[in-house]
């Protein structure tokens, strides 16, 4: 990215109300404990509505029945979403059995939702069950700390499980980074786990008393797979190996996909290369990036507060030099690396130690017992006999990891009997959506509930043009916050209003290019008309091995986004 307009290191002005809230919260306590005992409302009041996010929860309501309840003079049907902290997506079968039971017994929807942040969410937790869910997680060695709001969120790690020593090492670093950047406040333990208050004063040596200016996302990625979509994240450690052993990381900083419709000060941005660092400097560098963003990030405008905007304001080289100063190192030149794809390899893959790994495609990541496809029961039955663990992928799928040869047939039979290994087209495997309606308060258009039937129609277009064995990375996100990562898709739909989307084209299969808006505020049938024409051209005019996104750029259908801060909206 360019250094054309270096600006002030710190943005002066009136701080946002979120900054006041954090400062007055007594290190994230607020009055959450008192609010839990208020039976007059199903929700949290005042600052607590936002403070619970630091504890891994969002307050939501069922938007399908919001108007009906308002007509009955009832408050919305409040319930919480809880997101678990699960670095690298690894979960034991003991933990899985516990979360399966909680979902069945204590949530409105009865489902487990795998997310593209490589963890799981519960939707529909009533207020009376909020404390029990944290205690259940703690009882099996899990927590929900720092999975939302202005902290370092769940750390992602490439999912190919244990195919080499490299993957095991990378996963350990994901855990170390996650632990190192956690908040130190005792508020979580006091409120949810009934741990006694201690006399010592809380301190936050890394995050600070007002935490970060905005959410912060971190990945550890092993080329050539970009399954974790590094360019959606603030801080990325790209594993560099010599003779199959991890020796260090390339650091890329300042990716992020969230925008606001019509606000040209917002844009999606790919991460910038800072340089290579040996392993021993990893935690110092991670801390230096976070504290630089802590001190320089914009606290006067939350829509301009993420690391990507800080980099553009102060300049990449200035930010990089400050990270070097704080970490006490000089970055070496970037080591060579490349990404060739980011999909999961569905089915069996053999790893090291003669163990096998079974990747199961879970459409939209929603684990529930559907008619004729009891996915949730199937995974529970596998968890009862599997001696290894599960891994959640950043594509919202699930890996049954480290299966011995003599257990393979039994686990495969359970998976097949419960609809977990039904045949899936390459197109469906490479499509993804965020949750959106009915639970997300930000949703503008359907996403998860829209995707399956939409992909049926896209597959019809692919069949018509003779490319049914191909795939186009397709993503639907219900609003411009971009949880569905549509801003790294070949075909990205961004919700604008019920039944209407902005259509973005020109991303690539490996997730290294931002797509540009092609048509604005259009219906499903208009989207399909565009795809019918363009897929037809792709089928006839493409070069050998050329993906749809690359074709749309080469053919001049869409101009590539080269410098997002300046050309994203052109």
Swiss-Prot record:
Molecular functions (GO terms): 4 iron, 4 sulfur cluster binding; heme binding; metal ion binding; NADP binding; sulfite reductase (ferredoxin) activity; sulfite reductase (NADPH) activity
This enzyme's EC code(s): 1.8.1.2
Pathway membership: Sulfur metabolism; hydrogen sulfide biosynthesis; hydrogen sulfide from sulfite (NADPH route): step 1/1
Family annotation (Pfam families): NIR_SIR, NIR_SIR_ferr
Highest taxon of the lineage: Bacteria
Cofactor binding note of this UniProt entry: Binds 1 siroheme per subunit.
Cofactor requirements of the protein: siroheme; [4Fe-4S] cluster
The species this protein was found in: Klebsiella pneumoniae (strain 342)
Record's function text: Component of the sulfite reductase complex that catalyzes the 6-electron reduction of sulfite to sulfide. This is one of several activities required for the biosynthesis of L-cysteine from sulfate.
Enzyme class label: oxidoreductase
Keywords carried by this UniProt record: 4Fe-4S, Amino-acid biosynthesis, Cysteine biosynthesis, Heme, Iron, Iron-sulfur, Metal-binding, NADP, Oxidoreductase
GO cellular component, one term: sulfite reductase complex (NADPH)
SUPFAM superfamilies: Nitrite and sulphite reductase 4Fe-4S domain-like (SSF56014), Nitrite/Sulfite reductase N-terminal domain-like (SSF55124)
Full protein name: Sulfite reductase [NADPH] hemoprotein beta-component 1
């Amino acid at each position: 990215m360019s250094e054309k307009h270096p600006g002030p290191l710190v943005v002066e002005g009136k701080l946002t109300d979120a900054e006041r809230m954090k400062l007055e919260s007594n290190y994230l306590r607020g009055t959450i404990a008192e609010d839990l005992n208020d039976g007059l409302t199903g929700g949290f009041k005042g600052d607590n509505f936002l403070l619970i996010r630091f504890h891994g929860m969002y307050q939501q309501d069922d938007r399908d029945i919001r108007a009906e309840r308002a007509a009955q003079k009832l408050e919305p049907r409040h319930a919480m979403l809880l997101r678990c902290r699960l670095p690298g997506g690894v979960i034991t079968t003991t933990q899985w059995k516990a979360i399966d039971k909680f979902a069945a017994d204590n949530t409105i929807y009865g489902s487990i939702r795998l997310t593209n942040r490589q963890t799981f969410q519960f939707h529909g937790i009533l207020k009376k069950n909020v404390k029990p869910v944290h205690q259940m997680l703690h009882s099996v060695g899990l927590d929900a700390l720092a999975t939302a709001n202005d902290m370092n969120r769940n750390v992602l790690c490439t999912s190919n499980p244990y195919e080499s020593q490299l993957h095991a090492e990378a996963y350990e670093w994901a855990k170390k980074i996650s632990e190192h950047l956690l908040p130190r406040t005792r508020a979580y333990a006091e409120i949810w786990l009934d741990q006694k208050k201690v006399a010592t004063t809380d301190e936050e040596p890394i995050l600070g008393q007002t935490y970060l200016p905005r959410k912060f996302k971190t990945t550890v990625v092993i080329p050539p797979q970009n399954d974790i979509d590094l360019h959606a994240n603030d801080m990325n450690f790209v594993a560099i190996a010599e003779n199959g052993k991890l020796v260090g990381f390339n650091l890329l900083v300042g990716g992020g996909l969230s925008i606001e419709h019509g606000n040209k000060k917002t844009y999606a941005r790919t991460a910038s290369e800072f340089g290579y660092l040996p392993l021993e400097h990893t935690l110092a560098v991670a801390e230096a990036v976070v504290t630089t963003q802590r001190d320089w990030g914009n606290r006067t405008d939350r829509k301009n507060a993420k690391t990507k905007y800080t980099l553009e304001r102060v300049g990449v080289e200035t930010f990089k030099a400050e990270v070097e100063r704080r970490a006490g190192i000089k970055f070496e030149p970037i080591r060579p690396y490349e990404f060739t794809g980011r999909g999961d390899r569905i089915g069996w893959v053999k790893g090291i130690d003669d163990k096998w790994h079974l990747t199961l495609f879970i459409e939209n990541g929603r684990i529930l017992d559907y008619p004729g496809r009891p996915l949730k029961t199937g995974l529970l039955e596998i968890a009862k006999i599997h001696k290894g663990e599960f891994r959640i992928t950043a594509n919202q799928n699930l890996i049954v990891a480290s299966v011995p040869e003599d257990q393979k047939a039994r686990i495969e039979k359970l998976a097949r009997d419960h609809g977990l290994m039904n045949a899936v087209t390459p197109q469906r495997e490479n499509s993804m959506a965020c949750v959106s309606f009915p639970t997300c308060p930000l949703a503008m258009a359907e996403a998860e509930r829209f995707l399956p039937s939409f992909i049926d129609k896209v597959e019809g277009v692919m069949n018509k043009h003779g490319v049914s064995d191909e795939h186009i990375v397709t993503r639907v996100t219900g609003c411009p916050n971009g949880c569905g990562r549509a801003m790294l898709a070949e075909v990205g739909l961004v919700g604008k209003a019920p039944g209407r989307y902005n259509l973005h084209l020109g991303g690539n299969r490996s997730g290294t290019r931002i797509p540009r808006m092609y048509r604005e505020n259009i219906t499903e049938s208009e989207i399909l008309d565009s795809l019918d024409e363009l897929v037809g051209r792709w089928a006839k005019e493409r070069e050998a091995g050329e993906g749809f996104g690359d074709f749309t750029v080469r053919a001049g259908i869409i101009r590539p986004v080269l410098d997002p801060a300046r050309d994203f909206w052109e």
